[in-house]
Curated annotation (Swiss-Prot):
Any GO MF annotation of the entry: acyl carrier activity
Transit peptide (first-last residue): 1-36
Family: Belongs to the acyl carrier protein (ACP) family.
Primary localisation category: mitochondrion
Protein name as it appears in the record: Acyl carrier protein, mitochondrial
Short name of any one Pfam family annotated for the protein: PP-binding
Modification comment: 4'-phosphopantetheine is transferred from CoA to a specific serine of apo-ACP by acpS. This modification is essential for activity because fatty acids are bound in thioester linkage to the sulfhydryl of the prosthetic group.
GO BP annotations, alphabetical order: iron-sulfur cluster assembly; lipoate biosynthetic process
Matches recorded under PANTHER family: ACYL CARRIER PROTEIN, ACYL CARRIER PROTEIN, MITOCHONDRIAL
NCBIfam families according to UniProt: acyl_carrier, PRK00982.1-2
A single Gene Ontology CC term: mitochondrion
Function: Carrier of the growing fatty acid chain in fatty acid biosynthesis. May be involved in the synthesis of very-long-chain fatty acids. Accessory and non-catalytic subunit of the mitochondrial membrane respiratory chain NADH dehydrogenase (Complex I), which functions in the transfer of electrons from NADH to the respiratory chain.
Protein keywords: Electron transport, Fatty acid biosynthesis, Fatty acid metabolism, Lipid biosynthesis, Lipid metabolism, Mitochondrion, Phosphopantetheine, Phosphoprotein, Respiratory chain, Transit peptide, Transport
């Protein structure tokens, strides 16, 4: 009894599946291009980086009141050690939805250098 049901269902299922699914309109179209929004201005990038730095929880209370500019050094002015700098750069990566390569991250020492790198990255948004 079950043998006949399995035999019938195996013949009917593929044709029913084709009828239900049909051909997709997009199946012949290939979208092989990426769309970019307008690049961020340096002022926008700078303000967002400064906001991330001020919100960074490793900062001492003095940093929130301190004036942060493009000349601000992560180690000297903010007092961040290497691990804190990496955590800050990860927070900046998350803010702009980008990935900063390790070699580049090792060279970023100030807010200005970070802003320049992000502004030149077309994937930043």
């Amino acid at each position: 009894m079950f043998r006949s049901v399995c035999r019938i269902s195996s013949r009917v299922a593929p044709s029913a599946y084709r009828t239900i699914m049909g051909r997709s309109v997009m199946s012949n179209t290939i979208l092989a291009q990426r769309f970019y929004s307008a690049n961020l201005s340096k002022d926008q990038v700078s303000q967002r980086v400064i906001d991330v730095i001020k919100a960074f929880d490793k900062n001492s209370p003095n940093i929130a009141n301190k004036q942060i500019s493009s000349d601000t050094q992560f180690h000297k002015d903010l007092g961040l050690d290497s691990l804190d700098t990496v955590e800050l750069l990860v927070a900046i990566e998350e803010e702009f939805d980008i990935e900063i390569p390790d070699k580049v991250a090792d060279e970023l020492r100030s807010v200005g250098e970070t802003v320049d790198y992000i502004a030149s990255n077309p994937d930043a948004n």
